[in-house]
Amino acid sequence: MSLKTGLKLAKNYSINFSLPKRSKRKIKFIIIHYTGMKKESNALRKLCHYNSKVSSHYFIKKDGEILNLVPDLYQAWHAGKSSWKNIKSLNRYSIGIEIHNPGHQHGYKSFSLKQINSIKKLLKYLINKYKIQKKKRFRSFRYCS
């Protein structure tokens, strides 16, 4: 799928999401994670395997390709039992993005330039589409409990 922004998304659906569809107005946050796994293929498999009980809306590969795993209007399972201020269960109100990176456990590496360019385009698109307020943009590990 090609968006008006020039962003190209590949479909690779995960079955890990909650029904029913949510209103576009419910989406208030974007939460970005890194995978923390050595192999990109293992991270993607985990995000799409039912037994893992984890998913995200988008997955950004090392080469910058963006995979759309869960449609935006469904609740992906990326934030766990989370809260921020007086809001519980951030999965209900957020878009989750996973960027492939082995993380600190496996020799943390800088994100590729292609990943950085892709996340910038994707964020711009999502922020405009869902009117995400600047004060509701944060890094998941720092502000969520």
What are these regions, as identified by a protein language model?
Residues 2-131:
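Active-site-adjacent loop/helix surface patches within enzyme catalytic domains
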